[in-house]
Amino acid sequence: MLVLRRGGGQDGGCSVPVSASEVGRMPLTAPQPSSVDVLIVGAGISGIGAAYYLQREHPQRSYAVLEARAASGGTWDLFRYPGIRSDSDLHTFGYEFKPWRDEHSIADGDRILAYVREAAAEHGIDRKIRFNTKVLSASWSSSDARWSVEVESAETGERTTLSCNWIFCAGGYYRYDEGFTPRFEGREEFRGQVVHPQHWPQDLDSTGKRVLVIGSGATAVTLVPALAGTAAHVTMLQRTPSYVMPVPAKDRLANQLRSLLGEERGYAVARRKNILQQQAVWRFCQKYPKAARRLIRRYNRKLLPAGYPVDEHFNPPYDPWDQRLCAVPNGDLFRAIREGRASVATDRIARFTATGVLLESGRTLEADLIVTATGLNVQAMGGIELTVDGEPVRLADTVAYKGMMLSGVPNFAYAIGYTNSSWTLKVGLLCEHFCRLLTRMDARGVDIARPVLADPAMPTRPFLDFGAGYIQRVIDLLPRQGDRAPWRTSLNYSGDVKLLRHLPVDDPDLHFDRSTRTPEAVHG
């Protein structure tokens, strides 16, 4: 529970307890300016973090946070399916500037949502959020050094135009309005209910039902043990297995550090410990994939019933960390399988039937409820249509600069995190570097920064070089990355700390300019 000052009068208002959920939905009452220095798109964990760093490092700059939905929190407000939780520890997934105080390092969605909203309220960021405001397009004028941003009210449909010098896109990487569901033959014949986790009905009761979860990713391995507590039985149907590893829900050492060193210092030490641990695991898997596969298999076999077909259901055809490794707190998925409350089927769907699904092997799986945990619909840069001096920007023709800007697109930054570690570790560094860039621009007396690719023949590859299906479906619509810095997107936290936090901002590929129509650019 938070305590905010409300009201006016001579006493300056009264203290009123306000829940974190209420804070995340508090509307702005004062008139909002149509022109600001920075527009931050998205009021999720990345957008709130970006706002914190911006107002800390540049308190003189005006900004607003545009949120398309009616509440803050992003993913953690949108997803409401049973068991929703992080798959990274909160000491690294949380903000560097705000300690995670809960004893659970793998936390459920409600706790993470409260944490994000509390951070916004503590720093006054919640008062900068404009809810129900969807960004449709943004048009850049080099002569004015301004973006004209068209937004639409989700409540009235009214469209207005805002103006800013910078856009920081923190709206995530997937569509909020719909998840991905493949076309299943015969789906209309199924007499039960079919739901997607992204739009989970709050009144859905799975008690006593036969539940079929289609998928094998993080959402599926979260849902299965959560539903298995009350369902008659839960079956996870997967086309291809994923690597699944148990992790402790509570970090005993982190909790001891907090007790010994205090909240701030204990959190900082635990965060550093877990960063090093994540890096070590990823590097081991990259360098010794066969050994990593054997080790994971050994853990799986130990946690599953004797004689269980581990190789059939938990032995992917790719190496560890070619796709994201699924973490299950305290091995809850394996426990549900051991206890007979859940099972795994590895096969392909031939068609839906009236009572379940028919598999290509000829086997039938009966179900009362089918959950399609089949992934996301990726949407780069929040789906914003960008135009630079009258020319439309085609994302697939751009190359990512330092993992935060696009070649040829001035004064536009975005937040994309790690796929091999906690997402927000990278986002925090990008926010810091963005603020350093603004400081450098102030020192040089310029108001335009544009990455320019000096070598058009440089070999490129996909920006998100990741094997997950939801990425592969849209790979040709996303920006590219190069084969060298600063055009190569790094997955190395230590290297990014050096590049984004410590090395000079100036770079030959980053061109600076002024809005006074000067004919010559100011190069890095």
PLM regions: where:
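Core beta-strand elements of the Rossmann-like FAD/NAD(P) dinucleotide-binding domain
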Residues: V36, T156-W166, T207, E360-L369
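Short beta-strand to alpha-helix junction loop
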Residues: W100-E118, I214, F284-R293, D319-D332
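Beta1-alpha1 glycine-rich phosphate/pyrophosphate-binding loop at the start
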Residues: A20, P33-I40, I45-I129, Q238-R239, ...
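Feature captures the FAD/FMN-dependent oxidoreductase FAD-binding
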Residues: E103-R175, R351
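Rossmann-like dinucleotide-binding core of oxidoreductases
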Residues: Q32-S35, L39-I40, I45, G49-A50, ...
